[in-house]
Amino acid sequence: MTMELESQEVVVETTTAAAAARAASAAHVRTTVALRLLAFAASLAAAVVVATNRQERWGITVTFKMFAVWEAFVAINFACAAYALLTAVFVKKLVSKHWLHHMDQFTVNLQAASTAGAGAVGSVAMWGNEPSGWYAVCRLYRLYCDRGAVSLALAFVAFVAFGVASSLSRYPRAPPPPAPR
């Protein structure tokens, strides 16, 4: 006579759940790495586009160093690109760390703030604000403004990729559905 205990049944279910979690973890790691590499590429491209952006007209050369917000944009995008690359490389070791989500949130907020600040300055440059004495200058420096718009679009892509990666770091794996009885 064999007697089956409840604890034996739970052990079998737990083992199956652990195997399902490992399988979900591999897909989770691949997705996280892909998102972080996308954020790396977009942040790096946005920073490089702005850092190399310059236009000369009538003896006046416009560069990103003329505006503090663009300097901050470049610095933050380089920092976010470095963070994205480091976390993409070490994601298998970091996926279980609780502080990863907090750092991801910090990075998302930095990316959002730098993109919003640069976008606000770009908006004033594009359309101006005549009551305050700011005139639209993008008619004169069209190439500079177009490259700035491209870098803002790239930074927004990085922001979205960081946001999704941050969500995945908060909920690293979905629990398997309960077994039917």
From Swiss-Prot:
InterPro entries: CASP/CASPL, CASP_dom
Ranges facing Extracellular side: 52-65, 129-147
Any one cellular-component term (Gene Ontology): plasma membrane
Mode of membrane association: Multi-pass membrane protein
Top-level lineage group: Eukaryota
Cytoplasmic topology ranges: 1-30, 87-107, 169-181
Family from the record: Belongs to the Casparian strip membrane proteins (CASP) family.
Assembly notes: Homodimer and heterodimers.
Record-given protein name: CASP-like protein UU-1
Species, as recorded: Sorghum bicolor (Sorghum)
Source taxonomy: Eukaryota, Viridiplantae, Streptophyta, Embryophyta, Tracheophyta
